[in-house]
Design a protein with these regions (language model features):
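RNA pseudouridine synthases
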Residues: 1-334
Length: 334
């Protein structure tokens, strides 16, 4: 028999998932048979697969030792590629016991991929480990996660969760549109300020978006709504504040390109000649502000209601200042 005391990182996890995380090569059929035969208990009572664990729960597993890792064995994890062993230093904009707002620089991945390049999740995990808030070797049931990702070429604010409960509840906040994001971007051409609506279609094979004026006959397209507020202009360029009413893949970049005012430096949707003439090699797009609306009291992150997190002195403003001073900036390509 094995006993476990649930931690904060186990809060809200299904009991069946917890059992699978602490056992090894335990057949699913035997797992559910153990539930039926009362060999899995929580606080002395029969456990049910759908039960949600609470921190402090005492979980007793009357399961043969052959299905548990040897005593003292560390959780089995795939070794990280050499590139990932030393992650970049994390820039923390806001932090509490549950979440952190991080600054993601341009070209840094949010999550790991097959390249093995540095990424924000592993950098945040390393940061928490150095603070003593997370043990990557001893914890095999949860890894700190990113709640709202940004494209690799986009910089700005990203929310990270320290625990399973925080990740679950932040994802619910995002799903119910109780988190609003604002961006700064530099456009090639001066757009009109206002709210713009269009129809979005994603080519998943090529990871490219097309924008249309109307819904398709098969109704595959999804509506997008984007707010544009022109803050400053300099020759053919505009510094704009963008508000996302909907949040779709590449929405800002593709929608502005559809309006004829693409993001400066955007390789996929942008003005290639202007990118080359200005020497801009990355998209001028930055998530500068995150605001929380009225979060329900039953959500553990309710205390964030009304909170606004801002990125101070974003680099994109300095980038625009450089364009403003450059009087040799060429006219917009027709």
């Amino acid at each position: 028999m094995k006993q476990y005391t649930a931690t904060a990182n186990d809060e809200g996890v299904r009991l069946s998932r917890f059992v699978q995380s602490v056992t090894r090569d335990f057949p699913t059929s035997l797992l559910y048979k153990s539930f039926r035969n009362k060999r899995i208990k929580v606080n002395g009572k029969k456990g049910v697969p759908e039960d949600r664990i609470k921190a402090g729960d005492l979980i007793e597993l009357y399961i043969n030792d052959e299905f548990f890792p040897p005593e003292g064995a560390k959780p089995t994890r795939k070794p990280a590629p050499k590139k990932q062993q030393n992650q970049p230093k994390v820039t923390v904009i806001y932090e509490d016991e549950n979440i952190a707002a991080l600054y993601k620089p341009t070209h840094l991945l949010c999550h790991s991929d097959r390249t093995g390049d540095a990424n924000l999740v592993d950098a945040f995990t390393q940061y928490l480990a150095q603070k003593g808030e997370y043990d990557p070797q001893g914890e095999n049931r949860f890894k700190p996660g990113i709640c709202n990702r940004l494209d690799r070429g986009t910089e700005g604010l990203v929310i990270a969760a320290k625990s399973y409960a925080a990740l679950r509840d932040m994802n619910e906040i995002i799903r119910t549109d109780l988190l609003k994001k604002e961006y700064y971007t530099i456009t090639v051409g001066i757009p009109q300020s206002g709210r713009f609506t269009a129809w979005w279609e994603h080519d998943e094979k090529n990871n490219k978006v097309s924008i249309h004026a109307h819904q398709s006959q098969d109704e595959r397209r999804k509506q997008i709504i984007t707010d544009v507020d022109v803050l400053r202009t300099a020759g053919p360029f505009a510094l704009c504040r963008i508000g996302l009413i909907t949040g779709r893949t590449h929405q800002i970049r593709a929608h502005l390109a559809y309006l004829g005012k693409p993001v400066l430096g955007d390789i996929k949707y942008g003005n290639r000649k202007m990118n080359e003439r200005t020497g801009t090699r990355t998209q001028a797009l930055c998530a500068v502000r995150i605001s929380f609306l009225d979060i329900p009291e039953e959500n553990t992150l309710h205390y964030l209601s009304g909170k606004v997190i801002k990125l101070k002195d974003p680099q994109i403003v300095k980038q625009f200042d450089g364009l403003d001073k450059n009087k040799q900036a060429p006219a917009e390509e027709k």
